[in-house]
């Protein structure tokens, strides 16, 4: 088992993981992004799936995408998750659902179980992200 000191030494010089937060509700997106930054993550915020795809097709190294399922525009969170699985399978996906049925269906598109059901605790999301990153191959 690695000590905290060993783990810190390995991460010296490496950028923190980047989380893409996709949420149309500005205050929710800001609060969640601030919390994740306090936890040590780089955070990129977008308000819809189109903006999220622009980020993921740019030079931004996204590790985890967190998205609401219900969003405005032509693509919802399910569509975004399907796009990520097809075009960017290196990016892990976490979805957030306000309806239990949607949360279960989202489990097929998320690597770590069903979607987080609203209202969720920010700490629950951070644990899910940490778990996904621990299981993922390390990026260079």
Q: What annotation goes with each model-predicted range?
A:
Residues 68-69:
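Active-site residues of response regulator receiver
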Residues 45-64, 105:
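Acidic, metal-coordinating helix/loop segments flanking the phosphotransfer/catalytic sites
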């Amino acid at each position: 088992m690695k000590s905290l000191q060993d783990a810190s030494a390995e991460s010296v010089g490496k950028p923190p993981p980047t989380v893409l937060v996709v949420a149309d509700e500005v205050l929710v997106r800001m609060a969640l992004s601030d919390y994740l930054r306090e936890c040590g993550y780089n955070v990129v915020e977008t308000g819809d799936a189109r903006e999220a795809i622009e980020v993921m097709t740019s030079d931004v190294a996204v590790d985890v995408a967190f998205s609401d399922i219900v969003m405005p525009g032509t693509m919802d969170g399910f569509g975004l998750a399907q796009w990520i699985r097809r075009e960017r399978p290196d990016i892990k996906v976490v979805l957030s659902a306000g309806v239990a049925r949607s949360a279960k269906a989202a489990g097929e598109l998320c690597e770590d179980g069903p979607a987080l059901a609203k209202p969720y605790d920010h700490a629950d999301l951070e644990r899910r992200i940490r778990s996904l990153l621990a299981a993922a191959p390390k990026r260079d």
